[in-house]
Each structure stands twice: as C-alpha cells, then as structure tokens.
Amino acid sequence: MRFKAELMNAPEMRRALYRIAHEIVEANKGTEGLALVGIHTRGIPLAHRIARFIAEFEGKEVPVGVLDITLYRDDLTEIGYRPQVRETRIPFDLTGKAIVLVDDVLYTGRTARAALDALIDLGRPRRIYLAVLVDRGHRELPIRADFVGKNVPTSRSEVVKVKVEEVDGEDRVELWEREGA
C-alpha cells in the first residue's frame, strides 16, 4: 500500500470527538439513560474518550461497554476459519437505554449491521445511535451514522487507517492507496 495523505492529526481527532460528545448529549437531551458501546478494536478507546468529554462538560459519568461482533459478521468464511473472538463486556442493562455504538470508520455498513445484531441479542435498547470518527462512503447496506467526525469521500481502492494512542501509539487518520489499484 502507498501512503496518500494525513486526513486528521491528533488535535483534529480530539476536536471531532469533543464535538461528537456534545452532539450526543444534545440529541439525547442530556445524559439520562445514555450509554456508549465501543466496537472492537478502535471503537473502544474512542468510546472511552467520548465518555470522558461528556463527564467533563456534563459532570456525569456515562457507562461504556465493549462489543465484539466477530460471530455476527457476514464474511466469516472470507476472514478465515479461525476468527479471533474477543470479549464483549457490557456492565449495564441495555433495556430502555439510548445506546451509542462507536466505531472508527463507517464504510460498507456491514460492521454496524453486525453490531446491531449483537446488541439486540443482549437487550432491547430504547434507541441506538451510531457514532464514527470517519465516514468514507460506499455503503452496501442502508445504514448511516448519526454522529460523524469527518466525512471523507474515497475510492474503493483507498483505505482509511485510524490510529489511536491506546492501540497504535499515536492519534492520526491516514489515507492509503492499495497497490495496483
């Protein structure tokens, strides 16, 4: 793959997540009954950051859960016979809550669909929102994000890589081109 561009640096990521945090509280009319669920892998630290921002400006803690969607994916045969199943940890009852699913990139919509299936198996939320740092387009399913850090129109030959300090050692969003594309 060939590096093309930096789409967001650390301060830009922070500002986007801070804005998303405000938009979430505004849409929910406060923090009552609100909870965040980060999708493995990079959605988890993003969800925790959004929760910290909400706690900063609202003075109230918002619970955060962790969701593994591996067994809900529709491409298991394409990713190998031994998928790596990680922990799902949602330390609160979903029933009646406004849940914000948090992921790094929205592309085809298949990850979000799998996350919705997994969540609904765990309870019956009052409302489910989707928050993403980057929406790159190219939907294959009728899914859209409610909260978006940055819309980045891409070609199918391009790859958006989100790096987060907690996983990758730095905060940065990059655009890459697949070789031979």
Swiss-Prot record:
It catalyses: UMP + diphosphate = 5-phospho-alpha-D-ribose 1-diphosphate + uracil. Gene3D superfamilies: 3.40.50.2020. Its EC number is 2.4.2.9. InterPro entries: PRibTrfase_dom, PRTase-like, PyrR, PyrR_bifunctional. It comes from Thermus thermophilus (strain ATCC 27634 / DSM 579 / HB8). Substrate binds at residues 41-42, 82, 86, 103-111, 136, 160. NCBIfam families: PRK05205.1-1, PRK05205.1-3, PRK05205.1-4, PRK05205.1-5. This is Bifunctional protein PyrR. The keyword Repressor applies. Probably regulates transcriptional attenuation of the pyrimidine nucleotide (pyr) operon in response to exogenous pyrimidines. In contrast to pyr attenuation in Bacillus, PyrR from Thermus could act as a translational repressor: the binding of PyrR at its proposed recognition site in the transcript would prevent initiation of translation of the leader peptide, resulting in terminator formation and reduced expression of downstream genes. Also displays uracil phosphoribosyltransferase activity. Keywords: Glycosyltransferase, Repressor, RNA-binding, Transcription, Transcription regulation, Transcription termination, Transferase. GO terms for molecular function: RNA binding; uracil phosphoribosyltransferase activity. One of its GO terms (biological process) is DNA-templated transcription termination. Transmembrane segments: none annotated. It holds the Pfam family Pribosyltran. A motif (PRPP-binding) lies at residues 99-111. HAMAP family: PyrR. The lineage of its organism: Bacteria, Thermotogati, Deinococcota, Deinococci, Thermales. It is an enzyme of class 2 (transferase).
